[in-house]
Amino acid sequence: MTISNTRPITPDLIASHGLKPDEYERILNLIGREPTFTELGIFSAMWNEHCSYKSSKKWLRTLPTKGPRVIQGPGENAGVVDIDDGDCVVFKMESHNHPSYIEPYQGAATGVGGILRDVFTMGARPVAAMNALRFGSPDHPKTRHLVSGVVAGVGGYGNSFGVPTVGGEVEFDARYNGNILVNAFAAGLAKTDAIFYSKAEGVGLPVVYLGAKTGRDGVGGATMASAEFDESIEEKRPTVQVGDPFTEKCLLEACLELMQTGAVIAIQDMGAAGLTCSAVEMGAKGDLGIELDLDKVPVREERMTAYEMMLSESQERMLMVLRPEKEEEAKAIFVKWGLDFAIVGKTTDDLRFRILHQGEEVANLPIKELGDEAPEYDRPWTPARAPSPLATNDVPQADVSDALLKLVGSANNSSRRWVYEQYDTLIQGNSLQLPGGDAGVIRVEGHETKALAFSSDVTPRYVEADPFEGGKQAVAECWRNLTATGALPLAATDNLNFGNPERPEIMSQLVHAIKGIGEACQALDFPIVSGNVSLYNETNGQAILPTPTIGGVGLVRDWSKMARIRFAAANETILLAGAPESWGTHIGQSVYMRDIHGRTDGPAPHVDLGHERKVGDFVRGLIEDGLVTAVHDCSSGGLALAVAEMAIASGIGATIDAPAEHDPIPVFYGEDQGRYVVTVAEGSAETVAARAKAAGVALPVIGRTGGNAVQLGDARPVSVDELRSAHEAWFPNYMGGDLAPDN
């Protein structure tokens, strides 16, 4: 259906574009007339939450974004961090939540495609991907279908494009029943003197369209991603984009080849709001106007309107400002790769965004007010309310070994092998640590010893209980996971997934989580260099668990000394770095309370950032000096799960003592922060103990490796085979449909 640009602008039409009455008034005051239909669509796309961050911008500004290694912080397609020797890592994490719920395969696939494009737009070749996935309860009728589609979509795109998936998360909770989360991360490598930016410079220069043709897929996608779901969800299926990883691979190679010619002045990928957003961002950043002639845009469907072309989110497309003398050379590269190359406009000096179609001017708007001067809100938020502590004697009991078996085989703590074996984890030939450990690690090509570590973390149940502590914990756990491989954590990207910010209690979650993230990043020298905010993750008024995912990158100076989680040998000493006197104390919000006793009460664990840093720096020093043989951070499931995972990974058992006079439940299942399980060979034990004493780090000996079972204190031993069977069984059984879902 062709929609006229002179369609009457009614209150219903304004509301259907996600614009509030006061925002429409602002448009009228800004342009001094009623907008055309195309202009209304452009404002809707640029002023929605997905593109403008209007509810979160005030708080995002408070995050630490600078550091000695930060070359580019937030505001570009991705963050850029120096990794020495003239190399840099370019990375970002972004959500594709709403599309993935409506159309799981394409939603997840184009989420991967979009984040890869953000990275190579900056001039970097993608070298690693991660995906943090959150689904509804296993017994919800849609969950299995969504898991299957999303995992296939992530694998289908990443594998075909040729980037290894090195890590991620998969979690289930009934609060995601109506809104799943698909947070995609990508990282690439570039030279520090060859980074490309999106800021247009120079007047009268050609604006070039690159890549695939424009269709009607994804029209209105960014607006959909800024609204809650309701009963009309199926009608939103046409707003999901369709991806082609092979075209994207060609686009990558063509862009990197073009960048070597010196032809590129500015480049921006077409993501949310397509041609509109990319053109506005390039012009607004450079204080330039942009004029586009839509008759020149390569299309794959007939009779497309200006509105559809401006708002299409067809994939695998770029916009570029080009040096005119390089036009023929640039065109030849794209023709060689079988891609479209079309000059569709020019830069101007009047700060206007002008759109021509079939000889008519269909839009003429002020570019700055569309872009970096979009509306910004200081939404009301309620004060923080931390839950009361559990009573001292409120420690529900269970058999320690039964609990261990149940937790290692539970929906949220079982092996994710079923997921990551559908991803190519080895392509490019640089993978050193695959999913299943604390962090994924890849070698930096062309360098003998250097590697990069990647981790993605958040504990939503902590954030719901206490957004400030939960925000701190997400950063601390990511930093800890990188450290556990021996990496120096460099910087992070944040993907903030929350409900409707117009509700003060939800806005409060967002505000306090950002405050916690900021405090932790500051204390740990772990700046935020890129990110994404996804709000309105609600269905019929039911919000998701607040989920501020943190993706982090660390530098391993010598990968031959890198630590892994698996026990290296029998008869080694097991130590607990950073342990409190009783080894573990905090069971509020623990998986033990949730999965064994069905309780979600109590406070989140406190994160002492000074302690976190001291213990982490100490452990990293041990790894770099070759003094430890295995390392695993203590997080979900506490000491018990950490030891069990180390045993499962190695096939070697462990005997863990228990401190006298202490209840074994918090000792083994407490989720106190800032702890690492480490093993040392006989010859290193005294050296390590002396270093711990000098550093002021608690490092009690808690047991020994060996045998074929895990024994926790006085509890009955559980064989490693039994633990592995339980750990590996849940996911394939569930996806095969022959498992009680809550097992």
UniProtKB/Swiss-Prot annotation:
Keywords: ATP-binding, Cytoplasm, Ligase, Magnesium, Metal-binding, Nucleotide-binding, Purine biosynthesis
GO BP term (any one): 'de novo' IMP biosynthetic process
Pfam families listed in its UniProt record: AIRS, AIRS_C, FGAR-AT_linker
Gene3D superfamilies membership: PurM-like C-terminal domain (3.90.650.10), PurM-like, N-terminal domain (3.30.1330.10)
EC number of this enzyme: 6.3.5.3
Compartments in which it is found: Cytoplasm
Binding positions (substrate): 95-98, 117, 241, 313-315, 534
One cellular component (GO) term of this entry: cytoplasm
GO molecular function annotation: ATP binding; magnesium ion binding; phosphoribosylformylglycinamidine synthase activity
Positions contributing to Mg(2+) 2 binding: 118, 269
Organism domain of life: Bacteria
Positions annotated to bind ATP: 53, 92, 494, 531
Swiss-Prot/TrEMBL catalytic activity: N(2)-formyl-N(1)-(5-phospho-beta-D-ribosyl)glycinamide + L-glutamine + ATP + H2O = 2-formamido-N(1)-(5-O-phospho-beta-D-ribosyl)acetamidine + L-glutamate + ADP + phosphate + H(+)
Residues that coordinate or bind Mg(2+) 1: 94, 532
PANTHER family hit by this protein: PHOSPHORIBOSYLFORMYLGLYCINAMIDINE SYNTHASE SUBUNIT PURL
Protein purpose: Part of the phosphoribosylformylglycinamidine synthase complex involved in the purines biosynthetic pathway. Catalyzes the ATP-dependent conversion of formylglycinamide ribonucleotide (FGAR) and glutamine to yield formylglycinamidine ribonucleotide (FGAM) and glutamate. The FGAM synthase complex is composed of three subunits. PurQ produces an ammonia molecule by converting glutamine to glutamate. PurL transfers the ammonia molecule to FGAR to form FGAM in an ATP-dependent manner.
Complex and partners: Monomer. Part of the FGAM synthase complex composed of 1 PurL, 1 PurQ and 2 PurS subunits.
Family in the record: Belongs to the FGAMS family.
Name of the protein in question: Phosphoribosylformylglycinamidine synthase subunit PurL
Name of the gene this protein is made from: purL
